[in-house]
Structures are given as C-alpha cells and as structure tokens.
Amino acid sequence: MENIKSFARYIFKTLGAGFSERVYHNSLEVLFKKHSVDFVSEQQIPVMFEGQEVGKVRADIVIENKVVIELKRGSSLRDKHTTQCFMYMKLLGINEGIIINFPENDCDEVEFQEICLAQLCNRCGRDSHLASGCYARTHVKGYAL
C-alpha cells in the first residue's frame, strides 16, 4: 500500500490539482508499468443474481488480484466512495482496497482510505462479516469519524 500511496503523492506533486480523474488514473498506470507492477485497469466485474448476470460494474485498478484501487477527484471522500470500493472487493473476493482522492486545490494533500476486510467486525464481532452483510465505518482504516 505504501508504494501506491507514494506513487499517488508523486503524481499530485508533479501534475498538481485541476486534472480529471482519468489523467490521474493514466498517470498511475504509467508508474505501474515503469515499476513492473502487475495490474488490470478498468476491470469489469459481473453482478450475479439468482445465477444470472444482471449487470456489470468496473473497478478502476486491481493490483495483482490482491488490492482494489478506487480513484476519486474532489474535495473529500464520502461514505458512498467507501461503499463502492467495498462492493468491488466483495465481488472480486479481495481483502484489501484503497481509495485515493486527488484534491481540487494544490494546497491540499492526496487523501487515502484503506479498507481491509480481514479485520474483525467491530459491530458483529465476526471476521466473516462479508457473508453476514455487516458493514460499519470501523472496518475502514483512516476513516475520519
């Protein structure tokens, strides 16, 4: 996770604020390729219901099938961003995720939110809360309560 954070900080320091999410996304891809990081960009994930595919969602970047990266550009992260990353992780069976928010102003810093599904659930006390559907803010590292 630290390399991912370092890459994001480097991109923001070099480019600055004001660019679209796509520009920051493409910049991360450049660094991942340069450093031989195995990744999939815009990974399509089927959504199944009653054995039928009812739609697809798309994760921004998946690293080595172990970490979901969700990119944002805006003033701050919101609960819906956490829910979105959590959903991708659940559908892919991946335990780690990180949301990266590139701020709108040069004077702000890149914001990170790590999500680890291997942690014990503080709400229900189980470590298999994905199956139970339990989800609380306390599952998220770095979440500003």
Where are these regions (language model features)?
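Nuclease catalytic cores
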Residues: M1, A17-E21, H25, E29
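Interdomain/boundary linker segments immediately adjacent to catalytic/signaling cores
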Residues: M1-A17
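Conserved catalytic cores of phosphodiester-cleaving nucleases, focusing on short active-site segments
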Residues: G16, F39, A59-S75, Y88
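N-terminal, polar/charged subdomain of small-to-medium soluble alpha/beta proteins
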Residues: N26, K56-R58, V62-I63, L117-A118
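A short acidic/basic microdomain associated with nuclease active sites
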Residues: E29, H35-G51
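A short, cysteine/histidine-rich metal-binding "knuckle" motif
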Residues: N122-L145
